[in-house]
Amino acid sequence: RSVCRQIKICRRRGGCYYKCTNRPY
């Protein structure tokens, strides 16, 4: 199984992208 969570990260410049993270939160 994949314990990966997809989070959306937005930068100040106005660029948003999705990143795969394994953070506890």
UniProtKB/Swiss-Prot annotation:
Bridged cysteine pairs (disulfide): C4-C20, C10-C16
Keyword flag Ribosomal protein: no
Stated name of the protein: Androctonin
GO CC annotations on file: extracellular region
Function: Active against both bacteria (Gram-positive and Gram-negative) and filamentous fungi. Acts on the membrane of the bacterial cells. It destabilize a membrane by modifying its properties.
Keywords associated with the record: Antibiotic, Antimicrobial, Disulfide bond, Fungicide, Secreted
Annotated localization: Secreted
GO BP annotations listed: defense response to bacterium; defense response to fungus; killing of cells of another organism
Transmembrane segments: none
Superkingdom of origin: Eukaryota
Record carries keyword Disulfide bond: yes
